Amino acid sequence: MEPTNDAETLETQGEVTTAIWPSSQILKTTIDIPGTLSHDGRYIQYNLFGHIFELPAKYKPPIRPIGRGACGIVCSAVDSETNEKVAIKKITQVFDNTIEAKRTLREIKLLRHFDHENIVAIRDVILPPQRDSFEDVYIVNELMEFDLYRTLKSDQELTKDHGMYFMYQILRGLKYIHSANVLHRDLKPSNLLLSTQCDLKICDFGLARATPESNLMTEYVVTRWYRAPELLLGSSDYTAAIDVWSVGCIFMEIMNREPLFPGKDQVNQLRLLLELIGTPSEEELGSLSEYAKRYIRQLPTLPRQSFTEKFPNVPPLAIDLVEKMLTFDPKQRISVKEALAHPYLSSFHDITDEPECSEPFNFDLDEHPFSEEQFRELIYCEALAFNPETSND
């Protein structure tokens, strides 16, 4: 799977360091952080702007902060056993609430289950020095140089071929995810990691859930700007079509270098998308609740805008695909497999090189009300699976 000859690589500009994890602030430094030995020299503590990273000795300098988000600091390091540069995400105070603990455990299990070129690879879950009392979890992933959010905010030139190749890779990864009966539920530019060679990988599966057979579909999902209309209208039995809507929004943001629907709140978000795709017909209201139908009916009727006229810089075939993705009725929305086979992506599409997951992911952990101690033990066992020769009992 290679980009076309016209798809230029992303430039590496000097010492610029870009967050490789969803982040609210980029940290740039070329200063080596000194370490302090702990636990009889088995671990080394690094102070990254007031955040203590306690890493096994195999993770060698340079230890550098590369991003900061709600979960804390992300740093880069070198795995001395493989000589690979890695990204280490520290999730702090994981067991303060069961939602965060479950989200962390779910993400670890999903990343272990997945094996795909367009999904970020997990390398390690660092074994805590103390089995029964650790509060922080460190997840180690392959290091990617950029994320799409920061790339779109930068001066980096992106061509139409970049947009096509990114769209293809997102859909290729999503096909694999959906084939495992998993919905990502939080697709957005900051959850799409990029390399200098334009390779794209999907990350952050903490909000992922099973496809509709599950009865656990009511938790908050999807950053507002990328949220499908059925979610904005309170549907709790949504399908994989919500991810397709998000991809359509992301693609148009790549092509136009600005968000497609930058809603200020839930009401404004719905207004913005209806101003573009028009007020839905009675048939399109489909399986929405009666309350949602009444709400739509009382809104001013809005005509559908011409995508071609509004976005003249976007190729006609791309417009055709996006219109099929941004369809109000999720039952009429194009599927990932159909999107991959769309003529716009014909230069990349190869069904023999678009693998599916060999078996569905088991979401059994969502059915159990685990205690803090049980979550701690389950996450420790995940770390032990990566480090079978070590046990810090």
Curated annotation (Swiss-Prot):
Describe its partners and assembly state.
Interacts with MKK2.
Give the source lineage, highest ranks first.
Eukaryota, Viridiplantae, Streptophyta, Embryophyta, Tracheophyta
Q: Which organism is it from?
A: Arabidopsis thaliana
Q: Which range is the signal sequence, renumbered to this chain?
A: none
SUPFAM superfamilies under this entry?
A: Protein kinase-like (PK-like) (SSF56112)
The cross-references to InterPro entries, in alphabetical order and at most eight, read:
Kinase-like_dom_sf, MAP_kinase, MAP_kinase_CS, Prot_kinase_dom, Ser/Thr_kinase_AS
Any Pfam family: Pkinase
Q: Which GO terms describe its biological process?
A: auxin transport; xylem and phloem pattern formation
Q: What is the official name of this protein in its record?
A: Mitogen-activated protein kinase 10
